[in-house]
Regions:
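Short, ordered loop/turn segments at secondary-structure junctions
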Residues: 27, 52-54, 117-118, 207, ...
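Conserved catalytic-core segment of NTP-binding enzymes
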Residues: 91-98, 106, 117-225
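Conserved GTP-binding G-domain of TRAFAC-class P-loop NTPases and closely related GTPase folds
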Residues: 209-212, 227-241
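General beta-strand structural signal in soluble alpha/beta enzymes
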Residues: 23, 48-51, 83-86, 112-116, ...
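N-terminal phosphate/diphosphate-binding loop that engages ATP/GTP or pyrophosphate donors
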Residues: 37-92
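Structural alpha-beta junctions
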Residues: 42-47, 107-111, 195-196, 221-233
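Walker A (P-loop) phosphate-binding motif
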Residues: 4-43
Length: 241
């Protein structure tokens, strides 16, 4: 039996006050968005899912390739949720629509979930100069980091590892530490980049790969001391609930 409201509560997301949520960082962003959609559906919320980059498309999602307000509204009325995006022919992935057009859709839904970053399924990343693609109208930014990067070399666990290596001032073979994760999560040159005035959360995914939860707890506690709300867990394990 699935527990609804689990990730909404875990990340302390006030969807009534802050309904537009952009997700950035490492692998797990799409899974988190789909999980949040499930929880929001259970609460009877109308949800639009979209992306400002690329995002894996679930064929079970009702897809609207148009930003026509009437068409999107009809799909939301019928299904309660909709993916609004173009589809890339070669990859079959959802791809970005114009940001101004996306913004006009916000009044049609209760919550909008936007994947605003890419990581090629790597658990860790430091954004390039042109990243992340957080829309100006987003209320919340959630950064995702996979805890399976801990203790492993930067070159194996980071998307565009050279950016992470340069940012941390470590060589590519250096193992990722808890302190590295904290630095990446809180720096304006890391995953806090372009957050500005928005509400910010950090989700540490894949806690199930750890032998014990103390490293995750330590990171969450340290981030809290810096004023950042963070949580850890496992999207894979959550699917079994």
């Amino acid at each position: 039996m699935k527990r609804y409201g689990y990730f909404l509560d875990l990340l302390k997301l006030d969807i009534e006050k802050y309904p537009v949520i952009a997700v950035v960082g490492g692998g797990g962003k799409t899974s988190l968005i789909y999980r949040l959609n499930e929880e929001l559906q259970a609460l009877g919320k109308k949800v639009i899912i979209s992306t400002t980059t690329h995002m894996a498309y679930d064929p079970m999602l009702p897809l609207v390739k148009s930003t026509d307000l009437e068409q999107v509204s009809e799909i939301l009325k019928e299904h309660g949720f909709a993916a609004v995006a173009d589809i890339e022919e070669t990859s079959g992935k959802m791809c970005a629509i114009e940001e101004t057009a996306l913004k006009k859709l916000v009044p049609l839904c209760d919550v909008m979930l936007i994947e605003a970053d890419g990581a090629k399924r790597k658990p860790l990343k430091v954004p390039a100069d042109w990243e992340p693609a957080i829309p100006d109208f987003a209320d919340v930014v959630v950064s995702v980091i996979g805890l399976d990067c801990l203790g492993k070399p930067i070159c194996e666990t980071a998307h565009r590892a050279e950016y992470t290596s340069s940012f941390l001032e470590k060589n590519l073979e250096a193992p990722v530490t808890a302190e590295d994760i904290e630095k990446i999560a809180t720096s304006v040159h890391g995953l806090y980049k372009n957050v500005d005035h928005k509400v910010y959360r950090v989700y540490l995914n894949k806690a199930d790969v750890l032998h014990d939860s103390s490293p995750a707890e330590h990171i969450v506690e340290d981030l809290a001391k810096q004023g950042t709300i963070a949580a850890y867990g496992s999207l894979r394990e959550a699917e079994k609930l």
